[in-house]
Design a protein with these regions (language model features):
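Membrane-integrated ABC transporters
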Residues: 1-53, 68-85, 103-107, 111, ...
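Transmembrane helix-loop-helix hairpins at lipid-water interfaces of multipass membrane proteins
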Residues: 2, 39-102, 179-184, 286, ...
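Juxtamembrane helix-loop junctions of ABC transporter transmembrane domains
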Residues: 14-21, 44-45, 52-65, 92-139, ...
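An intracellular "coupling" helix at the cytosolic face of ABC transporter transmembrane type-1 domains
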Residues: 131-132, 148-157, 161, 165, ...
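Helix-loop-helix
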Residues: 177-191, 261, 265-344, 349-353, ...
């Protein structure tokens, strides 16, 4: 596939430096705005915590110069003032601890609330996406939006952002405090800081590139795992285990390499910063001691004075409080960049265009009154198309199942048609079968009828109404679909049947199961209709899963049925059981059948043979056999269906 080739080419490229989209930050702030009051509380608590941290460093200078040094000179020292100062400092510490607890707890609530809202938005938007999106994106990659990308956001919101803000506030507060103590030593730290920032920029810049690459690789690995799990039977049938493992090993190695490189850069940052902090600590002690011994005038925000022992000790403590937040900022920036990469992917999903629907004709319950159709609220078993007109009037057209395609062209890609000039007319109650090799366009036609895709040219009419005028939900509600690949959901058998009509009663579900010949095996399950299915109905045979799928389509009692290769994966005995139920289900309905087994379409009213997106033959079984064309060759085995 083209996207696979593109993926492989991308894998071999050196990752480029990520560009942070300002719009991503703006949209994240939009989610934060809902918690405005709590965010203000968090900011206040972070300020209190940072101030408490700085005051503890300043207290050392006061403790040494104002209390300890004078007490050392007294013959009978009185410690009352020292004890009061220590109690005051203890109170400040308690305030700092409480502030830290409150902002961490509050940020946990905010972050989880935001993530819930983002997941809700993603899931709600995903329901509006066209089938084309899921045909062009691996399920594993879509799933990674809900797992890896949201987890990266969680870490940023609950940990990185608060720590980033706290570190920035601490840096500013400590810097002001250092100016309060000594201008000369502050200037020395600033000079040393330029060297530190150069190291941080080099390491953080490289790690951010590989953190972005890591997120991309995680999506690739998840997508491949999901693909192999779903196709595990095919893998084993064709003995493809070693090849699958080789491909996975390659993708996993690429993930390992990007994670190793990213974390190597990220993990060496703190040790390097710690050692540079130790070097600064020693140098400050030397500079401060030299200034004090030389009697250099100490200049600060409070004026000029002498360099005291308390000032030097306090400055040494502050150097740690200054360097550590800088290291934390650089480290948290990596987490923020990775989270923004995840957020960008999330917003790309949210920005995907929803399925367009400009229809205005709706499907309503109806009844006849004085020979005319009128809308009613109660279920009558009679449905009608409610058609509003520009002059304000309403007309009602009975839902019959009359389907017409006129000169229809279609292509999944622009200027690359896969269907050419398709014309068909299915009268209510007719059974129309499509026959042809894989890729001939059989399934594509049914996808156009229920508007999973829109045609490039021509018209499709449903009961005389152009289907572009019918709301998609109502159009699809009027059709029953049975696919070869059955999807069952976690829940009871009854719930899975009711999926076809959410307001169906238990009696209606059981009647649908009987019609599909599924009632017998369902009652033999441990809890009958209340048996809980898990893992896509993994405990059921393929035939049983297919029967439940047919019952699910039958419960809605639609006038049009689409059977997309519905019995091609069932054994002959089960097919006979299914076919008996299907014959009853198809009675009086317009039915479109796609099957590889020609025996299932032999009794169709019209059989259409497709080749390369064109209808090359049409007619009933007897007519096509008499013509001795492509259908005859397929039926007699001269050619095989693919």
């Amino acid at each position: 596939m083209n996207h696979r080739r593109k993926e492989e080419m991308t894998m071999n490229k050196k990752p480029s430096r990520p560009q942070v989209n300002p719009n991503t930050l703006k949209r994240l702030l939009g989610y934060l705005s809902v918690y405005k009051t709590r965010v203000i509380l968090v900011v206040i608590c972070i300020l209190l915590s940072a101030i408490a941290n700085v005051m503890s460093s300043l207290f050392i200078q006061r403790l040494i110069d104002d209390y300890i040094s004078p007490l050392l000179l007294e013959a009978n020292p009185v410690f009352d003032a020292l004890f009061r100062a220590i109690i005051q400092m203890a109170c400040i510490y308690v305030i700092g601890i409480l502030a830290s607890f409150i902002y961490n707890r509050t940020m946990a609530v905010i972050s989880q609330g935001i993530l819930k809202k983002i997941r809700d938005d993603m899931f709600a938007h995903m329901q509006t996406l066209p089938i084309k999106y899921f045909d062009t994106h691996t399920h594993g990659d879509v799933m990674s939006h809900y797992t890896n990308d949201t987890d990266a956001l969680r870490q940023m919101l609950s940990q990185s952002l608060p720590q980033l803000l706290s570190s920035c506030v601490t840096i500013v507060a400590v810097f002001i405090s250092m100016l309060y103590l000594s201008l000369w030593m502050t200037l020395f730290i600033i000079v040393f800081l330029f060297l530190i920032l150069k190291v941080v920029k080099s390491i953080a810049g490289k790690s951010s590139v590989y953190f972005i690459k890591q997120q991309q690789n995680i999506g690739d690995v998840n997508g491949y795992i999901e693909e192999i799990i779903n196709g595990q039977k095919v893998v084993k049938v064709f003995c493809h285990e070693e090849e699958a493992k080789a491909v996975f090993d390659k993708k996993n190695q690429e993930l390992c390499d990007s994670m190793t490189t990213a974390n190597t850069y990220a993990n060496i940052l703190m040790p390097i910063m710690g050692n540079m902090g130790n070097i600064l600590y020693v140098l400050l002690a030397l500079v401060g001691g030299s200034l004090a011994i030389a009697g250099v005038t100490n200049i600060s925000l409070t004026g000029a004075g002498v360099m005291t022992l308390g000032t030097i000790a306090s400055f040494l403590t502050m150097s740690k409080s200054f360097i550590n937040p800088i290291a934390q900022v650089s480290q948290q920036l990596n987490a923020v960049i990775m989270a923004l990469a995840g957020a960008t992917r999330i917003f790309e999903l949210l920005d995907e265009e929803s399925e367009e629907d400009h229809g205005y004709v709706t499907l309503v319950n109806a009844k006849r009154e004085n020979g005319e159709l009128i809308e009613c609220k109660e279920r009558t078993g009679l449905w009608a198309w409610k058609h509003p007109h520009s002059d304000g009037t309403l007309t009602y057209e009975e839902l019959k199942g009359d389907v017409v395609m006129e000169h229809v062209d279609f292509g999944y890609e622009e200027n690359k048609l896969v269907l050419h000039d398709i014309n068909l007319y299915a009268e209510p109650g007719q059974k129309v079968a499509f026959v042809g090799a894989t890729g001939a366009g059989k399934t594509t036609i049914t996808n156009l009828i229920n508007r999973f895709y829109d045609i490039a040219d021509g018209k499709i009419r449903y009961d005389g109404i152009n289907i572009t005028k019918i709301k998609k939900d109502d159009l699809r509600r009027s059709m029953g679909v049975v696919l070869q690949d059955v999807n069952l959901f976690t829940g009871t058998v009854m719930d899975n049947i009711r999926y076809g009509k959410l307001d169906a009663t238990d009696e209606e579900c059981i009647a649908a199961a009987k019609l599909a010949n599924a009632d017998g095996f369902i009652r033999m399950l441990p809890d009958g209709y209340q048996t809980v299915l898990e893992g896509d109905g993994s405990g059921l045979s393929q035939g049983q899963r297919q029967l439940i799928s047919i019952a699910r389509a039958a419960v809605a009692d639609p006038p049009v049925m689409i059977l997309d290769e519905a019995t091609s994966s069932i054994d002959t005995r089960t097919e006979a059981i299914v076919q008996k139920g299907m014959d009853a289900l198809m009675h009086g309905r317009t039915v479109f059948v796609i099957a590889h087994r020609l025996s299932t379409v032999k009794n169709s009213d019209v059989i259409m043979v497709l080749e390369h997106g064109r209808i090359i033959e049409r007619g009933n079984h007897e007519k096509l056999i008499a013509e001795k064309g492509k259908y005859y060759q397929l039926y007699t085995g001269a050619f095989e269906l693919e």
